[in-house]
């Protein structure tokens, strides 16, 4: 209980990232967090999907654990070991089994984006805030 309170206090005083810097060819571009739909990790590489004019996917130099600590938890939720999503990214939610949810995300080729069993309750609370 005490560690949860301490974590909540440190979270309240922590400034969250406003942008991520990505490399595009030889160019470096700042991407505002407001343009990010979700983050995903595949084979130890972390990607950031945007929804701007030309929806693009960028490689970022952060692990999902680092991203989770750097972004506002009111805006993003870690649904599994592979995904951190924003509410804007979610097109559809389907009850996948008695204890899991399947999400359809905008600009996502993966049609099996599942909320882990351990996070379903917290995810539902996050949706309802």
Place the predicted regions along the sequence by residue.
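Conserved binding/recognition cores within well-folded domains
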Residues: 1-112
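C-terminal output/interaction extensions
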Residues: 122-129
